[in-house]
Amino acid sequence: MEVPPVMRFARIFALTAFAAGSLLVAPAVPALPACQHFYTGPIPDRPVTGGHGPGTLVGAVNVANRLPAPGSVSGGLGADGKVTFTFARVSGAKAYRAFRNGQALQWISDWGQPTLTVTDASPCQNANYQLYAMTAEDNSPGSLGQISTAYRLDAGNRLATYRVPAGTTLSYRVTSYNDVAQTALGYSAGPGFCAVDARNIPWGTRFSVPGYGECYAADIGSWIKDDIVDVWLPGSQADAWGIQRLTLTVR
């Protein structure tokens, strides 16, 4: 029996719509878990005690005398639940390190491969991805380049540049440390360098601290979690600083 033209058209339309629908539906990407602080041990309660600063305000540190940071970051979250991205080479670099929220994610040696790629198999919500280049494979402080801007997944699950907007004010507890060592970014710890929770304040962020001066986020700490930053002061000045609740201003 011949099928009426209207029925033939309806059947073809239905099949076409079904096929189009099957092409338009992308694999579901599971929701990412919240990012956790890297230190899982106990952190003592640190109530505000008050204190005072050094008197002379600290100026902004100069971090320009290093290899430039890698750029041209491109990638995002895939259907496999991993974040994968590529980045551009830096002239003079022998290797690179990638970080998620201030924690080492991947070491990339440059042996001339066509593409430099980073993969995060365990991504989390609003993670800050950052990179630096190295002049040598030994990760010595003198070989480390400048830290890149942070990159976060946008609404389309693609990586996009991220920074805390200039002028943002943050009500934080501010503590002080006096360790004579290297910061996580390989700078000699000293005035103007600060430790942050890199989930909230990415490395490389500059901000002012009342009574202290200018801070450059270049370090992390086991007890530096959530609304705490740690400023560097020498010797007894660190003790005299105490624990203060202050309003930070992002530069």
What is the predicted role of each segment?
Residues 34-62, 125-126, 151-251:
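Solvent-exposed, well-ordered loop and adjacent helix/strand elements within mature globular domains
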Residues 21-30:
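C-terminal segment of classical bacterial N-terminal signal peptides
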Residues 59-91, 140-153:
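Pro/Thr/Ser/Gly-rich low-complexity, intrinsically disordered linker/stalk tracts
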Residues 120-140:
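Beta-strand-rich modules
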Residues 97-124:
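Recognizes extended acidic, P/S/T-rich segments that occur
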Residues 95-99, 206-208:
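Beta-strand signatures of extracellular beta-sandwich domains
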Residues 8-22:
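Sec-dependent N-terminal signal peptides
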